[in-house]
């Protein structure tokens, strides 16, 4: 007769996650998004929201590759938000958090510029996850 395996119920502390590996270039994102100098401040205002979300992802059970995909999609989301500022000048008056909340919803995000169907699906997945994170 085979011996029964008993699973341990001991909770072991998890090692601290070094989130800087996921955002090593985050401070450069606003410059990469900007078309004109006016684009940099709203881009910089998005970064604290992105950092908190990346910290949340890093503390989850997601694999590093999945987290990196979400981080890449955040970069795309920031670029799409800044692009929208050029089409609707009234958006420049809104705080970054509101721009971010308007850009993501329970179904995903807006259509990404020149993105494939696979890229759009991945982007929408990140936007849905970010939407749930931002919900009170």
Predicted regions and their residues:
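Charge-rich, intrinsically disordered N-terminal extensions
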Residues: 1-136
């Amino acid at each position: 007769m085979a011996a029964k395996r008993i699973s341990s119920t001991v909770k072991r502390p998890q090692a601290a996650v070094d989130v800087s590996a996921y955002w090593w270039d985050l401070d450069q994102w606003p410059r990469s998004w900007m078309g004109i100098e006016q684009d940099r401040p709203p881009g910089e205002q998005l970064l604290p929201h992105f950092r908190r979300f990346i910290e949340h992802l890093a503390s989850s059970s997601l694999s590093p590759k999945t987290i990196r995909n979400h981080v890449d999609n955040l970069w795309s989301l920031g670029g799409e938000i800044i692009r929208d500022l050029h089409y609707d000048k009234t958006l420049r008056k809104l705080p970054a958090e509101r721009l971010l909340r308007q850009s993501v919803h329970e179904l995903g995000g807006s259509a990404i510029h020149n993105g494939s169907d696979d890229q759009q699906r991945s982007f929408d997945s990140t936007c849905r996850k970010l939407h749930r994170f931002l919900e009170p």
